[in-house]
Structure formats: structure tokens, C-alpha cells
Amino acid sequence: MAWWKAWVEQEGVSVKGSSHFNPDPDAETLYKAMKGIGTNEQAIIDVLTKRSNVQRQQIAKSFKAQFGKDLTETLKSELSGKFERLIVALMYPPYSYEAKELHDAMKGLGTKEGVIIEILASRTKNQLREIMKAYEEDYGSTLEEDIQGDTSGYLERILVCLLQGSRDDVSGFVDPGLVLQDAQALHEAGEKIMGTDEMKFITILCTRSATHLMRVFEEYEKIANKCIEDSIKSETHGSLEEAMLTVVKCTRNVHSYFAERLYYAMKGAGTRDGTLIRNIVSRSEIDLNLIKGQFKKMYGKTLSSMIMADTSGYYKTALLNLVGTDL
């Protein structure tokens, strides 16, 4: 299923929240779990991983009203490491969390281009608008300004272009003439010439609807005798290549894209915990169940089995709760 439909797939939600919800006893449970010496991590997991984000925000309000403390700050003071990072991520409203991930990717020395590419290429126009709004409210500068200040060249161009969210046309109408024109233009901008006309690639990939692009990719393959992915790999490199390939992957099947992100976050030595946490938290109330299905199809194992083998302790328990049972 293509990326633009993922936001409306109710069956994809792995964290549905509590049907008999009352924030006051939940807040009290959390207070007791962190009161005095020691922390009852399991109690924290049982509450926060089994509530929706809206419910968590209500728990935080109740916690403040009952005990005069900020819940997120209290959690930060009681927890540590990857487990703290995961639990704190759950406490952010969704758009503020995405804004934070983008801000963290750009602050300090170096830029985590992969995080920026992942978020901007896989979100819809409405989602991007809300993320930009949250970013400006939380950090006092616009996301576009910060991206322009932190990146350069064609990578900056494609990221700013993605921010405009022009790929959201879900009308289903596709102009066959324009499809052929775009496929030929991509061929002429890459395979047919010495060098590459990067702006032509950027313009078509970032401003056409997903339904249109799917047809363009088909026509391109007929003209070039190779898939668009192979042409991008041979014509570009580095972060620009990653950005273009991500747009193509998300256009073809967003669930496959996120399955791949999760798989490579755990494959091999070490774990890319930032990628693992961000994608499980941000997709848990959208389409994580659908991602799990693609994961099993693509890699022959379940997402939860890989998490069990690659993580440990309360961090593992919390992740598995968010992922839910494998289908």
C-alpha cells in the first residue's frame, strides 16, 4: 500500500489505548511507581505503553494537578538510558515528537540527514504542516529556515521541496501524456546524458502525486530498460541518493520502507536505537500492524522476534508492548 493511504488505516494501529480510561488512578500508579527509593519500571510500562497518546496527555495533566509535578520531567529523573529515551518519547504529542526528532537531528555538530529524510519523505502534506507548526512553536524558528541553514546544495533543495507536501493529490486522476513526458524527462536528465540534471529529478519526484509517480516509474523502466532505483544509484550518491530513493520507496510502499528501516536498525552488530524508538513510537497509532506484516513478508521473521533477540530488560518489554502481538 502506498504511503498516502497509511494515515487512514485503522487496522494498522498497534496501540489503541484503554477503553475504560480514567487518568487519575493512572497518574497515581505512576506517582507511587516513582516515589521514594527505587522505581517500579514495570508499573510505568503497564500504564504508558497501554494508553494512546491522547490518554497519556490526560495522565500528565492529572499527574500535575494531583502531585504538582511535571510527569515527563519526573520520568527523566527516575529512568535512564534507552528505556528513558523510549518512555519520554511516548509522552510527547505526536507532532511535537517529530519536531523534536528533526531539531535533534540538526542541533550541535554534524547533521543526521537520514532522520530528516525519513520524516519529510514519508509524511503527508497535513502531517508536515502540523510538524512545521509544532517546530516553530517549540523552537522559535521555522523548520524550513533551519533545514536551509543546516544543509546545502541539492540535498537542501530536495528537503525544502519535500516540505511543501506537493505529492498529496489523492484524486486518482493521472494524465498519461504527462506521465510519458516525465518518464522521458527523467531519462534525459540522467541515463541519456553525461552527468545528471539533479533539479529535474527533484522537481518530478517532489511535486507529482504518488499515483502519477507510480505510472512514471513503469514508463521509465520501459524507456531506460532499468528501474528508477538503479538509475538513481548510478547517477547520484550520498545523502541526495538516499533522499531520492526514500521518496521512491515511500511512493511504492510505505510499509515496506518502514519495515526496512526497522530491520536495518537491528541487523548486524549494535542497534540503532534512535531509529528503532522513533519508528515504533511514531507509527504505533498509525500503521505499525501493517508494517509488521510487511516485515515478516520481507525478512521471514517477525518484528517482535528480532526485538527480543536484539534488546533487553525493561527497554525490550516496553518495545514489545508497543509492537503488540505479531499477526
Swiss-Prot record:
Entry binding sites for Ca(2+): 266, 268, 270, 310
Q: Which UniProt keywords apply?
A: Annexin, Blood coagulation, Calcium, Calcium/phospholipid-binding, Hemostasis, Metal-binding, Repeat
Q: Does the keyword Metal-binding apply?
A: yes
Q: Superkingdom, according to UniProt?
A: Eukaryota
Cross-referenced InterPro entries, in alphabetical order? Annexin, Annexin_repeat, Annexin_repeat_CS, Annexin_sf, ANX8
Q: Which Gene3D superfamilies match?
A: Annexin
Coiled-coil zones: none
The molecular function terms in GO held by this entry are: calcium ion binding; calcium-dependent phospholipid binding
Which biological processes are named by the entry's GO terms? blood coagulation
Q: Does the keyword Calcium apply?
A: yes
Annotated Annexin repeats reside at 21-92, 93-164, 177-249, 253-324
Name a Pfam family for this protein.
Annexin
Q: Which PROSITE patterns match?
A: ANNEXIN_1, ANNEXIN_2
The family classification in the record reads: Belongs to the annexin family.
Q: What does this protein do?
A: This protein is an anticoagulant protein that acts as an indirect inhibitor of the thromboplastin-specific complex, which is involved in the blood coagulation cascade.
Domain commentary: A pair of annexin repeats may form one binding site for calcium and phospholipid.
What's this protein's name? Annexin A8
